[in-house]
Amino acid sequence: MSRRKQPDSPLFPLQAPVPDFTFERAAHRDGFWPVAGADEAGRGPLAGPVVAAAVILDPDAIPAGLNDSKLLTAEQREALFEEILATSTVSIASSSSARIDTTDILKASLDAMRRAVHGLELAARIVLVDGRDVPPGLSCHAKAIVKGDSRSVSIAAASIVAKVTRDRMMARADATFPLYGFAHHAGYATVKHRTAIESHGPCSLHRMSFRPFRQV
């Protein structure tokens, strides 16, 4: 009797990992407390700042539903943003498009994260950072965590704060630069945004070091 071949992949897709408090607990066991999470929003857009946030969660008041901001709806992000601000220690910093053009997007992002961490009213003993790079010049210990916004609740909270803050900034910028539709795409390279750039040229919020502006 022949055996049925096992499928190469599971019958049901695996769920995306949900961030938890594992990294924070490990840091606490190692003697590092408080623990902050840090993340940024806006590395990829053609326009606007990159915004970083640092968050120290209250272990007794962690908002339900924390996750990578990219996996949440705008309504979910807004609700969690308000809850995070009400229950946590939060600091926000940004690097402008001019700063991005003067240095580069990675340096500008890391500098914004450093300033966000240093702006916390409660000094962190260690900061968990999303990605592979740790901001230079931190006054505390740091640990880089790849895909940290889907693994650590502190980083997930920071990703939400950074994303909502930046989206609100770009919505306000739409009133000053109404030709580009910043309220709809937040500066990302959508077809509508590229068409507006072709029609009207770049504005002062555009990152001239990014394509397609290098030849403009």
Curated annotation (Swiss-Prot):
An individual GO BP term: DNA replication, removal of RNA primer
Gene3D superfamilies from the UniProt entry: Ribonuclease H-like superfamily/Ribonuclease H
Taxonomic superkingdom: Bacteria
Localization: Cytoplasm
Molecular function as annotated in GO: manganese ion binding; RNA binding; RNA-DNA hybrid ribonuclease activity
Family to which this protein belongs: Belongs to the RNase HII family.
Coiled coil: none
Binding site for a divalent metal cation: 39-40, 130
GO cellular component, one term: cytoplasm
InterPro entries for the chain: RNase_HII, RNase_HII/HIII, RNase_HII/HIII_dom, RNaseH-like_sf, RNaseH_sf
Enzyme class: hydrolase
The protein's name: Ribonuclease HII
